[in-house]
Amino acid sequence: MSYLRPAVVLLILLTLITGIAYPLLTTGLAKLMFSQQANGSLVMLGDEVVGSSLIGQNFTQLGYFSGRPSATAEMPYNSMASGGSNLAISNPELDKAITERVKSLRQANPTQTGPVPVDLVTASASGLDPQISLAAAYYQAPRIASIRQMPLSEVKQLIDSNVQKATPNFFGESVVNVLNLNMALDAQSHVKVPATSTKS
């Protein structure tokens, strides 16, 4: 029994350190040094929380930029069920889903005759990606310009002003956050569109 007492003491000590002290310390430091990130990188519009810059939303109105398809369970961009579709590239269901998405995008963007950007028809591994590529944003620009009655050049400038560059530049590609872009679009456009997005 002589070995039992130190084992119990060590268990209690490590539990207090790793289970209570360490989490409290790291959480406190995070809130002190990175307050916005520690609280979920919430995006505010006035006094209202409209989303998070880390989680995408399901924008369905044609007057808004849309993000990547979401494969999360129950509803799009469900942060409680993060995950991809897990469909192999050879799976007929994936091919069918992509074909339907391409058809829908071509109907919504009739002036675009080139290839549809791949991130507009494929879900990410998490199913929650809040960003799209610049190619995906530019692809939707003519539709947005038409519905919002804005010059196409102004819409493209709006995209350019919301670019998030990869850090460092050679690591990944530049992207644009869809929620931030749509908020900037609302602020600049005189034609208002009812926002119908599914928030997580």
From Swiss-Prot:
Primary localization: membrane
Keyword flag ATP-binding: yes
Family matches, as Pfam families: KdpC
Topology of the protein relative to the lipid bilayer: Single-pass membrane protein
Subcellular localization, as worded in the UniProt entry: Cell inner membrane
InterPro entries according to UniProt: KdpC
Keyword Lyase: no
Family per similarity comment: Belongs to the KdpC family.
Biological role: Part of the high-affinity ATP-driven potassium transport (or Kdp) system, which catalyzes the hydrolysis of ATP coupled with the electrogenic transport of potassium into the cytoplasm. This subunit acts as a catalytic chaperone that increases the ATP-binding affinity of the ATP-hydrolyzing subunit KdpB by the formation of a transient KdpB/KdpC/ATP ternary complex.
Subunit structure of this chain's protein: The system is composed of three essential subunits: KdpA, KdpB and KdpC.
Name the UniProt record assigns to this protein: Potassium-transporting ATPase KdpC subunit
Organism name: Yersinia enterocolitica serotype O:8 / biotype 1B (strain NCTC 13174 / 8081)
Upper lineage: Bacteria, Pseudomonadati, Pseudomonadota, Gammaproteobacteria, Enterobacterales
